[in-house]
Amino acid sequence: LTLKIQSNSLQHKTIMIQKLFSKSEALSQMHSFVESKADRYQEMRNYDFGKLENNFVSGLSPAISRRIITEEVFLKTILSSFSFNKVEKLIQEICWRTYWKGYLENRSQIWTNYLTDLVDLRYLKASREYENASKGETEIVCFNGWLNELMENGYLHNHTRMWFSSIWIHTLKLPWQLGAELFMKFLLDADPASNTLSWRWVAGNHTLGKTYLANPSNIKKYTGGRLFPENQLARKAVESNQDGT
């Protein structure tokens, strides 16, 4: 599978990540996470309390995506401290990126279609709806904040990525392809497979009969009450073009 990505963008991200993480710094962050947070990952992983240090995730995805450290090293470190049953969910989440890569490699038409769609949808970038969403100037305060966080830090909590994607697709009614492109542009850990397939899943194009619709109460709960977009989000998902592939 040949992934046609702008090499300059990837090179720029790699340089930024290398500035954030030397190998020793990445290993230090990994050990700190395993020692202080890994045992609570399963119960706390969906909470986004704002700053990374307040959350129960590792924040290592940029380092892993650029192979500063590998999944194997991370998994061995975790399993040297905990039984499999204690950290099963954490192990599953680390392996998701590998699963997505294999899935897309065996269904390369999904990527080809995505690239074609981006060309066909270019005209929408001139719309006010797209401009407001891509600049964080909507009427949904939490969405605007996430967009700013994405652009400034190159990172969003995984649960927040789902909320963002859902609002983009189902509330703002913008094509998932343009949202996926935005993530690819700004996320330091952006991966063509996991990013594309995750957006398709939220849109309802990945698993037949399944869409993801962000819920204001869910956002309030999992942000510790920081955010509550009451009466601002769509209650019905946009009809998907499901192909089940």
Give the predicted meaning of each segment.
Residues L3, K13-N158, S166-T245:
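C-terminal catalytic domain of photolyase/cryptochrome flavoproteins
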